[in-house]
């Protein structure tokens, strides 16, 4: 066992280790690129043939990856992609970066993790380090992954291969913190595994590596990060609803509270939560808590508040149309600006704006959308195309404009000047908040 550790550490030091990344999405591709840039030959795997071909041609499809970096790494042979799991037999260190969504019953769906583990097990060789990076409930690494890998490979964890967990911390569109400079948390089954995982990430990243005492600690800390955000955004949404009823500007309240130099962190309301982590992760924790007879009442309350925000925003929009324009939502023309789940990115996973559009449509509104980063999106098997651009004449055609993502490149001054009515759920038009035609969440 010590010999296995020493060999892996030696390979890491010499940059002779071959790294594998399973899943080439928003998490996996940036990680694969950073490993290759650090001098480790890296092979990425994805079930989508299109992604494999794009990577092997040096074409980037992820906003947080620099195009020229990907092309250079592919051209010099440091990075390649495949859809054949047999590559696992050639790698020494493999990171699993696959989706962990919810099923139709809002229960954890770890199908991708399970199927990846089953395929990896078929080709797993002695001396390999396996790390799960997908966000999941505490216990997944030891209770699910370990038995699958051992049963499928005939190898013993800790003796023949190492296993650990290191949560991804990707924040799409963040201009400051990328994969390279975001601190990493690592947890392994056994101290030797932790040492190997930490050594690898210390060789790849320009950031601190925190060594957790177990995979469960590392799994729980990621859930804590996102549940913390979920709960505080839920509080902000509830406060915004109350402030509206009381005739108080919540955004001014937050600005005032933010002057306190300690003990307060601002959170802002919106049409709901989006992205792959924050709306979903608390469900993973709540589900796991029931195994221990524990009810996560605060967490579930915040989830309920956040999940209802798209409907609340449409209700506010309907009342606004009725009060200001004496029009019903049914038959009104509505332009939704921004379908990305947050500002300045092209990612619409779990975006509340899509729910807003669905609810508007179901209530009889004639809905179009504009997003400078997303020309079309898929939802429930259908494709909805957005407007290619908007100008004064375009905006004047609509009874209501709803702002659901605060993209900086949008001309809000033009909207403020020409829109009949605006409902701004993101305070994107704060510079024009004095206009009579604008109402803010």
Labelled PLM ranges:
Residues 1-441:
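Structural/interface elements that position substrates and couple domains in central-metabolism enzymes
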């Amino acid at each position: 066992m010590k010999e296995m550790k020493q060999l892996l550490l030696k390979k890491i030091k010499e940059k002779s280790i071959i790294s594998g990344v399973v899943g080439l999405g928003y998490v996996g591709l940036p990680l694969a690129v950073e490993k290759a840039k650090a001098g480790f030959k890296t092979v990425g795997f994805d079930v989508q043939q299109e992604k494999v071909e794009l990577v092997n041609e040096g074409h980037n499809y992820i906003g947080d990856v620099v195009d020229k970096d990907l092309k250079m790494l592919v051209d010099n042979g440091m990075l390649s992609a495949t859809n054949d799991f047999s590559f696992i037999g050639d790698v020494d260190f493999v990171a699993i970066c696959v989706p962990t969504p919810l099923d139709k019953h809002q229960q954890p769906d770890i199908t991708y993790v399970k199927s990846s583990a089953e395929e990896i097990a078929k080709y797993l060789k002695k001396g390999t380090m396996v790390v799960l990076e997908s966000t999941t409930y505490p216990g997944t690494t030891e209770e699910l992954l370990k038995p699958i890998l051992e049963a499928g490979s005939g190898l013993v964890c800790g003796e023949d291969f190492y296993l650990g967990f290191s949560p991804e911390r990707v924040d799409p569109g963040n201009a400051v913190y990328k994969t390279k400079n975001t601190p990493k948390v690592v947890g392994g089954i056994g101290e030797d595994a932790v040492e190997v995982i930490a050594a690898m990430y210390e060789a790849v990243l320009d950031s601190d590596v925190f060594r957790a005492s177990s995979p469960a600690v590392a799994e729980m800390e990621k859930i804590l990060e996102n549940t913390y955000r979920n709960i505080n955004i839920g509080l902000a949404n509830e406060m915004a609803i109350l402030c509206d009823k009381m005739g108080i500007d919540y955004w001014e309240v937050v600005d005032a509270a933010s002057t306190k130099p300690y003990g307060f962190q601002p959170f802002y309301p919106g049409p709901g939560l989006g992205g792959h982590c924050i709306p979903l992760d608390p469900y993973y924790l709540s589900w796991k808590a029931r195994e221990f007879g524990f009810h996560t009442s605060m967490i579930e309350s915040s989830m309920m508040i956040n999940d209802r925000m798209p409907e609340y925003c449409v209700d506010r929009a309907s009342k606004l149309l009725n009060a200001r324009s004496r029009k019903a939502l049914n038959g009104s023309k509505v332009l939704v600006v921004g379908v990305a789940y947050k500002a300045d990115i092209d990612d619409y996973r779990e975006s509340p704006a899509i729910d807003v559009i669905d609810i508007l449509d179901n209530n009889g509104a004639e809905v179009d959308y504009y997003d400078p980063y997303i020309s079309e999106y898929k939802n429930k098997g259908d494709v909805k195309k957005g407007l290619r651009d908007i100008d004064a004449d375009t905006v004047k055609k609509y009874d209501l404009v709803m702002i659901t993502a605060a993209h900086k490149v949008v001309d809000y001054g033009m909207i403020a000047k020409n829109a009949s009515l605006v409902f701004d759920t993101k305070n994107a038009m704060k510079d024009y908040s004095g206009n009579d035609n604008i109402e803010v969440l």
